Structures are given as C-alpha cells and as structure tokens.
Amino acid sequence: DMCSKYNHLKEENKMSRVYNFSAGPAVLPEDVLKEAAAEMLDYRGTGMSVMEMSHRSKAYDTIIKEAESDLRDLLHIPDNYKVLFLQGGASQQFAMVPMNLMKNKAADYILTGQWAKKAYQEGAIYGKANAIASSADKTFSYIPDCSDLPVSEDADYVYICENNTIYGTKYWTLPNTKGKLLVADQSSCFLSEPVDVTKYGLIFAGAQKNVGPAGTVIVIVREDLVTEDVLSGTPTMLRYKTHADAESLYNTPPTYGIYMCGKVFKWLKARGGLEAMKEYNEKKAEILYNFLDESQLFKGTVVKKDRSLMNVPFVTGDEELDALFVKESKAAGFENLKGHRTVGGMRASIYNAMPAEGVG
C-alpha cells in the first residue's frame, strides 16, 4: 500500500540535510519540519492535512488564532496593534504602505539597499517620496547616521528596511523620526531579537527568511492607522482595514504557511523566546565575524558597527577564488553561499534556524 511504499522510499533516501545558507526561502528548524511531516496526512485526528482544511473550519480557526497569540507573546505586541497574515510578500507592502498611510501624499525613505530602494520607487507612484539619507555611495556597506535627519514636514511616515539581506547591514539604533511614524521592513531580522513594537507605526516581514515558507507576509500595525481613509483607487484587498476587520480571513489566506509560522513561533517560545534567540544569534555571528576579521584570505564587506547578525557577506577580492570557494563549499554540504550579484563574493545567511555547527 501507499504507506509502506512511502516508508520504503524514506529508508532509501536517508539523505543527510545540508547546511543551507540561502537568503530566503531559507532554513527552517528541523524539529518543526519533522512535526509538520508527522501531521501531514492526518492533522490531530481531523483525518486531513492542514493543506486540505477549510479556512473557515474550527480546527483551522484554532491554528490561526494560536499563531497570532504566540506571536503576540513573543514580541509583547500591545493590544492596540493589529496582527495580519497577508499574501503578496514584503514587495506588496511597498505599495500597501503608501496606499494606506499616505494622507499628505508624502513620505521619507532611507535608502540602505535594494529593498529600501524598491519601496522608495513604489512610494513615488503614490505621492512624493523623499530619499532623506542613503548609503549608496559605498555600495550600501553601512547605515547612514540617522540621529538628525532632514525629515520632511509633510511626511506621513519615515520608512526603513531594518536589516539589509543583500548587503548585510542592520540598524542597531532606530532613526530619530522627529515625531513621524516609523515604518519598517523587518523581513530578514524578524524574530531574531526582542523588539519594542511601540516604537513603530507599522512593521512588516515576509515569512520566508526567519519564520516559515514563502507565501505569507506578517503585518503588525497600530490600530489608529487602520482606517477607511486610504488613497482613492485602493483595491479592497490592499486595505489593511479589510483584513483587520476579517481577522486575516477576508478571503482564503495562505493556510499552510500560517500553520508553519505558528509552529516556528512555538519553537521559539520553547527555546526561551527572543532574548534567548538573540543570544544564540550573537554567538553564531561572532564566530563568523571573528574568523573573517582574522582571516588572511576572506574579508567582510560591512562597517563593523552596522553588521547584521542574519546576513554576512564576505569576499576574497578575487572572483575566481570566490567561485572556487562556493563550489568546494557546496561539495562539502554548505549550500547557497554565493553572494548577491550586486555585491559578488559570498554571503552566509545565518537565520534563527541555522545551527551553530553550520557556522563553527
């Protein structure tokens, strides 16, 4: 029968898992994958997979509610913030943010990489987008000083990409927005450390880096920003209010993705929450950065004070040598170390689920 065939296949394919340094979709905790595999055919006595379950069913309602409640616990999200599980990735938020938050049709953007730049270009479609600081002059290898920014008087928000996946930089101090709303794309650092949600008007994160499979984007938005007052022509599906009112069930959500995110939230809670996660991430990053700082062959590309704990780009200075390193690493079971084409060299993405052994 099917089951014995499946078990036989499993025996045959006793594959060892590689160390996957992909920037996203990225490594997920092995325990979570095993648990999902065990529940694949029959989720807790329902006789069906979560993939097959109606999003309006009692069983699924419990899954999505628990996912939200665990996320609230992890980040200590106050009651006056909504949690939304949406689709369209972080890239769709580049449009949703201005559509919903641009009241004066103006916003300030800090350009620290490809994704901040894309958000800025998208913002410019809907109103006046001002680039008030940028690190483009040095290939985005640092975070500009944001202590005294020329914040525009009429700006509805100041926008940052908090961790720059491609360039390996991170804001360790949030910008002084001079009283303006702060909007942050946290896709590649989400849940890697504790965060004071109250410092932001809106946070969003694509799930496929630190929390789950691709297809889900998590939005945390202060409820006074969730209104009917959106740019004219904003589609129903692109209004935060549509999804907040329907508790992320306005239409069929990415049900399986949310279920997987929920499992990762439980995994994080079991490991001591975000304080413990930050400590572990610091330990992993330190091993790698210390090695790069002492190495005669490799060097990191980021200004020390702005180094990300999640994405670590490094180079040898010789393209052929870089290519050889990537090739030999792959043969040794270290996958996806090739750097982004705009930086070259290598990049190790060492998200929450990357075990320390993969780095050390």
Where are these predicted regions, by residue range?
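Conserved active-site segment immediately N-terminal to the catalytic lysine
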Residues: V183, V197-Q208, V217
